[in-house]
Every structure is written in C-alpha cells, then in structure tokens.
C-alpha cells in the first residue's frame, strides 16, 4: 500500500523543514520546493511564482503545505507581493490541476494588523491591511486562497501561527540572540507589548490536524501558543541565557528613532536589516489571539509552556554555539 504524499513549498525553511520531518515520521512521502534543491530530502529547486520546475512533483499528493513567503520587513513591497500573493495563486493553480485534495495556506496573525485588534481576537474579526507590505500581502494572499476555495477550485485551510520560536527560528530565536550579543535589543512600550509565542513542535501538531481534519476545509485557525506574555518576559529568557541584564526598554517613539537610525546605518553598509519602525510597532501590540476555534474544531491544545520551550531552545542554542 502506497504512503500518502505531501508537498511543501518553502521546504528548506524553518517551518518547512520541521513540517517535512514530522510528516515523514507520520508515514507520509514528503516532497517539496525551495530556492535551493536538497535531493536527500526530496526538495527540488524552484520559485513558487513559476511552477514549471516543480509542478510535476505535485502528482499524487493529497496535501500541499504552502509555507513559502517573504517574511521580512526589509524587502521591497513589490517583491513581497510577487512572492506572497502571486506565488500563492500559482501554488493554488498548480495544486488544483494536479488533483491535490487540499492546500494549507500559511498566513500570519499579522493579517489582523499590528495594532487596533481586541485582546483574544477571534477568526471572526476582520483582517486589516495597514499599509505595511508584509501585513498587506498576508491579507491579500488569504483572500486569494479563500477565493479558490469558494469557487470550488480546490479545498483550502488557512492557518495563522503566532510568534513561532524554538530550534532553527530566525526571527524569534536566532536574530534576538544575535542582537542581544551586540547590545542592540531595545524594547518599545516599556517592554509591555504583548507577545504570542508558540513553540515549533506545538505549531507542527496543529498543522498536522489542519491538513487532515475533515472539518478544517474552508476554515481559518489562529495557532498561538499556551499563553501570551509581555515582550520583556519573552526576550528576557534570551538575556538570561547569555548572562546579560534584562532587556532595555524605552518609550515607543524613542525605539522607533533608534531602530530607524540603526537600520539606516546597516543598509548604508550594504547589509539587510530588520531594524525599522515596522518591527518596533509589532512589539507594541496590546493583545493576543484566541485559539478557541482550533481547540473546538481540531482538538488542538498547545502542550509546551514557555519555560519548557525556552529550556529546549537553550539546549539547541548551546549545541549550535549561539550562546558562546
């Protein structure tokens, strides 16, 4: 009896690689695409905007996990639209033509906008484009995905992960540690902005359910972690690991000025930088995200507390030399 097959876009990324490992452990034949090939993991080279190099690998797949996206505040808006919106449409088209049963589209809690949503926001709350390229493209990509579902083209499930951390996470593990070591981590809003950490293993468990549960088609799910915390609490775990003082905090306006200046210097030196006003605003959120729908429909309940997740993350960081 043949194994069920799954295809992952962005298969070499943090989440894509973790998904591949977990689906393989659950008996799936795993295939994927990313900008660089990895034959050992059945990953072919390609760009989601151009399906020609990879569309044949969709044949026989039950599910496509569409994780590929530009996840950066430092990339031009046009490039983000190409990858995040047009790329999503191309994946939907290719999957439908190959007879794939379902596409799981990876969005983000940022589709609610970075500010102005209620604490414990539910999936019924409207999404909000706010002029920031990453947010706007996530909103547009969701609309593109649900349009395909509504038209009967292909079944779609949308997931909105919280702030994913753990071994291999660049935005919420590796980069913060590097910034702390350089003495450059400064938190806005006095460190009281709300952070919604979800440990990578908990997220993967939720994705397995979203990809296979019969009631998940046509639905969207927030996938935050056990509980929201302040930014000062979250990033304080990393300063502790490095034997540094707790994160420095300043008023938001000061943080914006500092980040803008530092980011300008980095770009002048020819380096990409996430230091900008957009990153600062994200760390001033006033609320978290409800996971009640994922619990009710999928039976998903995150299991890894922040303390436990950070203990696992610290062990990985030490092994990889990031804490030296």
For each feature predicted by the language model, list its residue ranges.
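Glycine/proline-rich active-site loop of Rossmann-fold NAD(P)-dependent oxidoreductases
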Residues: 139, 152-154, 165-175, 201, ...
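Amphipathic terminal alpha-helices
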Residues: 5, 289-296, 301, 305-324
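Active-site Tyr-X1-5-Lys
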Residues: 131-157
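NAD(P)H-binding glycine-rich loop region in Rossmannoid oxidoreductase-like domains
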Residues: 46-86, 94, 112-114
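Mid/C-terminal beta-alpha module of Rossmann-like enzyme folds, strongest
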Residues: 209-274, 307, 311-314, 324
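NAD(P)-dependent short-chain dehydrogenase/reductase
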Residues: 149-195, 200-202, 238
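Conserved Rossmann-fold NAD(P)-dependent oxidoreductase catalytic core, especially the SDR/UDP-sugar
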Residues: 90-133
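N-terminal Rossmann NAD(P)H-binding glycine-rich loop of SDR-like oxidoreductase domains
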Residues: 6-26
């Amino acid at each position: 009896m043949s194994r069920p097959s799954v295809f992952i876009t962005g298969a070499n990324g943090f989440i894509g690689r973790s998904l591949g490992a977990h689906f393989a452990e659950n008996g799936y034949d795993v295939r994927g695409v990313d900008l660089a090939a990895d034959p050992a993991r059945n990953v072919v080279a390609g760009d989601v905007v151009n399906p020609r190099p990879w569309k044949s690998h969709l044949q026989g797949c039950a599910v496509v996990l569409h994780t590929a996206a530009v996840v950066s505040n430092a990339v031009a808006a046009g490039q983000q639209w190409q990858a995040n919106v047009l790329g999503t449409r191309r994946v939907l088209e290719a999957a439908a033509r190959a007879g794939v049963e379902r596409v799981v589209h990876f969005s983000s809690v940022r589709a609610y906008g970075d500010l102005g949503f209620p604490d414990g926001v539910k999936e019924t709350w409207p999404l909000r484009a706010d002029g920031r390229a990453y947010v706007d493209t996530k909103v547009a990509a969701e609309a593109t995905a649900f349009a395909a579902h509504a038209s009967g083209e292909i079944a779609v499930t949308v997931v909105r992960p919280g702030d994913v951390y753990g071994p291999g996470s660049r935005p919420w593990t590796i980069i913060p540690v590097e910034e702390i070591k350089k003495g450059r981590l400064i938190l806005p809003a006095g460190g009281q902005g709300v952070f919604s950490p979800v440990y990578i293993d908990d997220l993967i468990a939720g994705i397995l359910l979203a990809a296979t549960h019969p009631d998940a088609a046509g639905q969207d799910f927030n996938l935050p972690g056990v509980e929201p915390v302040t930014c000062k609490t979250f990033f304080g775990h990393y300063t502790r690991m490095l034997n540094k003082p707790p994160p420095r905090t300043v008023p938001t306006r000061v943080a914006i000025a500092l980040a803008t200046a530092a980011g300008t210097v980095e770009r002048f030196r020819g380096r990409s930088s996430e230091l900008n006003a957009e990153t600062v605003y994200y760390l001033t959120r006033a609320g978290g995200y409800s996971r009640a729908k994922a619990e009710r429909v999928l039976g998903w309940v995150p299991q890894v507390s922040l303390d436990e997740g950070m203990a696992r993350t610290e062990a990985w960081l030490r092994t990889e030399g990031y804490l030296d």
